[in-house]
Amino acid sequence: QNMKNKGMIRQGVFQSVDLKFNNGIVINAPYLTDFSVMSPFEIDFNGKNYILKYYNRYLETISFDTLDTNRNKIASNGTMYGNVTFLATDRLRVHHQFRCYFKMHDQGCKFCNVKPKEGNYDLSDVFEIIDFYLNNVDFRHFLIGGGSGKAEIEQNNIMAIASYIRKHTKKPIYAMCLPPENIEVLEEYKKNGINEISFNIEIFNRKIARTTMPGKGKIPLKQYENALKKAVELWGSSGNVRSMLVLGMEPIEDFLDG
């Protein structure tokens, strides 16, 4: 509450805050969700430092990252930095479009909180903003993602962004995107510098998926399977290929069968 009152705290993804430990580890911890009140962990301010406690017992002094004030800067062609990027934890997310294709057609995922951005998507502005963060801000890796795009546009933008990043830095690039119907596209992703990739199935039960995710739920599980198998061929099976799932959205039997 102390940092929030000062307007300094930097929000993490999905109603969370990044806790910074003295050994350099950063933990992304939800705190604006209903389940947060059940946590045995709490953070106190003793007038000087922020203290992490477990069942009211001292664990460690921690710190937070401050607000990314660069979000309000404007690129040469009028794009606000915060509409293209999101700096949190150890990464810089770069959006590959401003608006989720499914949300634009009233088929967005009902659990998603990604909001559409104003203006036109301009790759030259995106590259300018990437340059700024590379030259002025410390972070470990890139994430290309945020919302779903129309297949060809999404794929072309991902390749353009990845290629630009790779020409200017060796930082790892993680892409979170839809599974391409043409899996050969994944070879182009890798050639353009992507190191990790994720196709998020979220819900196995396709009937429930189509209700909860009207657009994305229409993608057959076989398309995910084909993309994931091809990705493992390209990036290996040691953690560079993944898929996120939402536990509790379908019967546990369907979840385990998936």
What are these regions (language model features)?
Residues G24-K110, V114-G119:
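N-terminal [4Fe-4S]-dependent radical SAM core
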Residues Q1-P40:
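Short Lys/Arg-enriched alpha/beta "domain-start" segment
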Residues Y174-E181, L247-D257:
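Active-site glycine- and acidic-residue-rich loops that bind
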Residues N113-I129, Y133-A160, R166-V185, Y189-A227, ...:
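Core AdoMet radical
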Residues T89-R91, N240-M244:
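Short, solvent-exposed beta-strand edge segments and adjacent coil->beta transition regions
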